[in-house]
Amino acid sequence: MLRLRCKARSGTQPLPGLTAHSRLRDMQAALAALTGVPAPAQRLLLGFPPRSLDLSDGERRLGELGIHSGDTLIVEEDTSKPSAGSPVVAKRTMAVREAVPVLARRVVPADNSCLFTSVYYVVEGGVYDPGCAPEMRSLIAQIVASDPEAYCEAVLGKTNREYCEWIRREETWGGAIEVSILSKFYQCEICVVDTQTVRIDRFGEDAGYTKRVLLIYDGIHYDPLERKIPDSDVPPQTIFSTTDDVVLAQALELADEARRKRQFTDVNRFTLRCMVCQKGLTGQVEAREHAKETGHTNFGEV
């Protein structure tokens, strides 16, 4: 049995029930049922960088097409092709069109790794994996270590080696430097919506990326943003086009609503407690000074 995933506009989900001996037409039928994109209108991409699959012969076996366990198939709809689908697909598509999708926050745990969990969730098309943080921390450390000239002490605030050791620790919080690195790695614009200032910081804005993902930030905690259809089992959308400015406006509306409800943390005034020595602290500056003096980096908000 092949362990496959499919990624479409609506999100990422498992693609079960196929083997290397399954035929292309069987896989396309399964993809149509999952994504709502009829087989005649499908354009399938595989690998990195993504390459287009030859769909001319539906009788070919998946093994012959170079499809292996662990692969993710990207499903796009070619609107230039006829899209007459089965009644089931047509009915599902009609129901989806009648509903209005909304942009919403997907809450993740406040466990010092919320940034990494949130970024993984959005770039993977809605895959929630709280165990992804160690791998992402290690990835960032490898990228930083590989380019000590670009990632020097002036940029990192500590030596390259110290930073690499620091970011691997599970109690270390991620921030702007890590978002910038992940934007380059995933080749997508990462927009961080700040609920305190109601502004959007766009990492990778000038890099020419075609994809955009969004996080919402309250001063200490990150959550991913997703566009979803209420009361529907249709997977949420977390990856947007960089030409989609509507989603940016919706994100600012969310941030403004959170600000009016005071759903943010003023990092200069919030009260913390060092979870190592139990000392009370006020604001980010005191926390940083305490960490520098004692080496304690595990803080909880009071």
Curated annotation (Swiss-Prot):
This is Ubiquitin thioesterase OTU1. Residues 245-250 are annotated as: S2 site. It is found in: Cytoplasm. Substrate binds at residue 220. A zinc finger (C2H2-type) spans 272-296. One of its GO terms (molecular function) is cysteine-type deubiquitinase activity. Residues 103-228 form the OTU domain. Disulfide bonds: none annotated. The active site is at 111, 114 (nucleophile), 221, 296. Residues 108-114 are annotated as: Cys-loop. The gene is YOD1. InterPro entries: OTU1_Ubl (IPR048857), OTU_dom (IPR003323), Papain-like_cys_pep_sf (IPR038765), Ubiquitin-like_domsf (IPR029071), Znf_C2H2_type (IPR013087). Signal peptide: none annotated. One of its GO terms (cellular component) is cytoplasm. One of its GO terms (biological process) is ERAD pathway. It is an enzyme of class 3 (hydrolase). Hydrolase that can remove conjugated ubiquitin from proteins and participates in endoplasmic reticulum-associated degradation (ERAD) for misfolded lumenal proteins. May act by triming the ubiquitin chain on the associated substrate to facilitate their threading through the VCP/p97 pore. Ubiquitin moieties on substrates may present a steric impediment to the threading process when the substrate is transferred to the VCP pore and threaded through VCP's axial channel. Mediates deubiquitination of 'Lys-27'-, 'Lys-29'- and 'Lys-33'-linked polyubiquitin chains. Residues 217-221 are annotated as: His-loop.
